[in-house]
């Protein structure tokens, strides 16, 4: 963990697992437009995601690419992980502030212009963590899995 990371945020995003995260706040773009792009890269290898985002036509691809690159650099600097071994374990977009502006209209009326922003969060972890997590999910006892299926039938 670096000196500038908030321990509570790291605990919420990663727990005690190795990895790193990056957050871009107040990105001047609608959260729904950013979510379209972030859904493409969630679960991908980090290097492949950065390469793919360079060729995406959406405007949201550029800030998301920068956040992924920042998370990779954070993992290399603070955790000593290699960029080739990282994958995007979590990626989500939250709504930021909404600036309200006024557009004058006919007959003295006015309408609102909403200038939305977003907070982009990306968490990268080593690929071994993904394989360990898959084994933990599939390693459920057979008796417990069987009893759940009988309840539903």
Curated annotation (Swiss-Prot):
GO molecular-function terms, A-Z: rRNA binding; structural constituent of ribosome
Coiled-coil blocks: none
Keywords, ordered alphabetically: Ribonucleoprotein, Ribosomal protein, RNA-binding, rRNA-binding
PROSITE patterns per the UniProt record, alphabetical: RIBOSOMAL_L22
Spans annotated as Disordered: 125-153
Cellular component terms per the entry's GO annotation: cytosolic large ribosomal subunit
GO biological process terms held by the UniProt record: translation
SUPFAM superfamilies reported in the protein's UniProt record: Ribosomal protein L22
Pfam families: Ribosomal_L22
Highest taxon in the source lineage: Bacteria
InterPro entries: Ribosomal_uL22, Ribosomal_uL22_bac/chlpt-type, Ribosomal_uL22_bac/org-type, Ribosomal_uL22_CS, Ribosomal_uL22_sf
Similarity-based family: Belongs to the universal ribosomal protein uL22 family.
Subunit structure of this chain's protein: Part of the 50S ribosomal subunit.
Role of this protein: This protein binds specifically to 23S rRNA; its binding is stimulated by other ribosomal proteins, e.g. L4, L17, and L20. It is important during the early stages of 50S assembly. It makes multiple contacts with different domains of the 23S rRNA in the assembled 50S subunit and ribosome.
This protein's name: Large ribosomal subunit protein uL22
Organism: Cutibacterium acnes (strain DSM 16379 / KPA171202)
